[in-house]
A protein has these predicted regions:
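Short strand-turn motif at the edge of the Rossmann-like AdoMet-binding core
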Residues: 19-20, 39
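Short low-complexity, flexible loop/linker segments enriched in glycine and/or proline
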Residues: 8, 31-33, 114-115
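General beta-strand structural signal in soluble alpha/beta enzymes
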Residues: 14-18, 57-60, 156
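Short beta-strand and adjoining strand-loop segment in the mid-core
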Residues: 26-47, 57, 71-79, 87-93
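A charged, well-structured terminal subsegment
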Residues: 47-58, 134, 140
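Conserved catalytic-site region of short-chain dehydrogenase/reductase
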Residues: 23-26, 65
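Single conserved hydrophobic/aromatic residue that forms the stacking wall/gate
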Residues: 1-11
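Helical "substrate-binding/catalytic lid" subdomain
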Residues: 64-184
Length: 186
């Protein structure tokens, strides 16, 4: 038992988890955010390689990188749904999409969806941001499980996950995450 435990500790100390955020565009330019989990010695051995791909952010021990990636995508998904809901409502009040985007991005409601996705992928109706809806659901599902495990109250993560899963049922396979706006619009 002691030998097995020592072997597991040794293996654990040689691994890192390093998921990324930033999509294809930032991968091409080497500007990804790399969320690294693992011990400092192991991370320092691969730091130079990771820095070529983007900005290394140390999340914590082994596994923290993957937890951070899931939590990041949950926050992104919640912002996405809120932004889509607000844009849809603004249009019903006669607010032009471009005015909505400009005002939100100059105010406290600004987020990645309002800055990057609304005009380029939603208002244009291209819906091709390059991140599959099923992958967003996977990450939000993991985040929801993490939140459930650590806290007794998690109403928003449950609602975000349910909304994305329902959207996936309507939109089908190979849907881009920006297509969720189509569901909300109808």
């Amino acid at each position: 038992v002691v030998c097995r435990r020592q072997r597991q500790m040794c293996i654990r100390d040689r691994f890192i988890d390093a998921p990324v955020s930033g999509g294809v565009a930032r991968a091409i330019t080497g500007k990804l955010i790399i969320m690294v989990g693992g011990n400092e010695v192991t991370i320092s051995k691969v730091d130079k390689i990771l820095n070529v791909m983007g900005s290394v952010k140390r999340a914590g021990p082994l596994g923290a990188g993957h937890a951070m990636k899931s939590l990041n995508n949950y926050v992104s998904a919640a912002g996405l749904i809120a932004s889509f809901e607000a844009l849809n409502t603004a249009k019903k009040y006669g607010i032009e999409a471009r005015n909505f985007i400009e005002i939100i991005n100059g105010a406290t409601g600004k987020n990645n969806t309002t800055e990057v996705k609304l005009e380029k992928f939603v208002v244009s109706e291209k819906y091709n941001a390059g991140f599959a809806l099923d992958l967003m659901i996977k990450d939000v599902s993991i985040a929801h499980q993490l939140i459930q495990k650590m806290s007794s109250d998690n109403p928003l993560s449950k609602q975000v996950l349910a909304y994305l899963e329902n959207s996936y049922k309507i939109l089908g396979k190979n849907s881009d995450h920006t297509e969720v706006f189509k569901v909300l619009k109808n």
